[in-house]
Amino acid sequence: QARVERVWSDEKGHYAVLSQTLFYPESGGQPADRGVLRGPFGEVQVLHAYEEEKAFGDVVHVLSAPIPEGVEVEGEIDWPRRFRHMQRHTAQHLLSQALLRAGGYHTVAVSLDSPVCTVDLEEEAEEAGVLEAEALANFAVYADYTVEAFYVSEEELARYPLRRPPKVRGKVRLVRIGDFDLAACGGTHLKTSAQAGPIKVLKWERYKGGTRVYFMAGWEALEDYHAKHALLARLALAFSTNPLELEKPIRKLQDELYALKGENQALREGLAEALLPRALEEKALLVPLPVLGELGKRLARFEGTFL
């Protein structure tokens, strides 16, 4: 519960600042919470939340309709959305630490605003290092480490072996995952590392002199697996094989297609050559559409001819 401290509207929407809030504002690569505010006015949707001033400003709630100033409200966060964000964020901490341990790869930026998340690394990562990191991150999931957040002063920071230096000054919020990872972070996290799994690396690529790693985690990784498994099952049924042997019939089909394309091209060229003398002699000639392009190329070599 909270009191509405300030409200305003403009051509883009309606806004409110509350005396206190549990709505997480978009920050640190993590999307904002959504949900509802309830009060004497009824119910309005919270569409977005952001900080007026980065790290220390009031949280501004973007609303679906205006509300009066000074009233008491009750907020409800869209919990399924929040939980998925927490899974992404805790999984990112685990994967970033695993990448550091497996290959000495340092995380410089993250994006958690879609089910497919990214971690940007300073170094060019090798396949063996990324795969080892994926396994290590999932071992950390199975270890069921406790996740805890606490604040320390700027002077106390030197006592803590942080994965990366903090970007803020003054009191700093740290997130510790057992004895596996410790990092400065203001985001929302799970209670234990086990809730973040599974963690699946999808791919990685060179990016700005380093590497961008794409991954999914938690329910979203499981949903992705279900979708891909269903697709493989349908394809396996169509090719009368099992999912793990699909590559062979697909490659065979590709080879047959390439061969047919070659034969088709040879037939078009042969027919175009056969029709060329008649096309040069006759004013009008009916030509099969697939051959028209090849015949046109040949006619273009002769002056005064056109299609």
Stretches with model-predicted labels:
Residues 5-22, 70-82, 167-182:
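Short, hydrophobic/aliphatic alpha-helical segments
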Residues 196, 202-307:
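Terminal appendage regions of diverse proteins
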Residues 10-12, 54-56, 67-69, 113, ...:
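Short flexible coil/turn linkers enriched for glycine and charged/polar residues
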Residues 32-33, 41-49, 125-148, 298-299, ...:
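Polybasic, low-complexity association/targeting segments
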Residues 81, 100-207:
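Functional cores that coordinate and move charged inorganic groups
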Residues 20-37, 68-119:
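Active/ligand-binding-proximal structured segments within catalytic/core domains
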Residues 1-71:
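Conserved nucleotide-binding/hydrolysis modules and their immediate coupling elements
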Residues 63-65, 121-125, 215-217, 289:
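Short beta-strand-to-loop capping motifs
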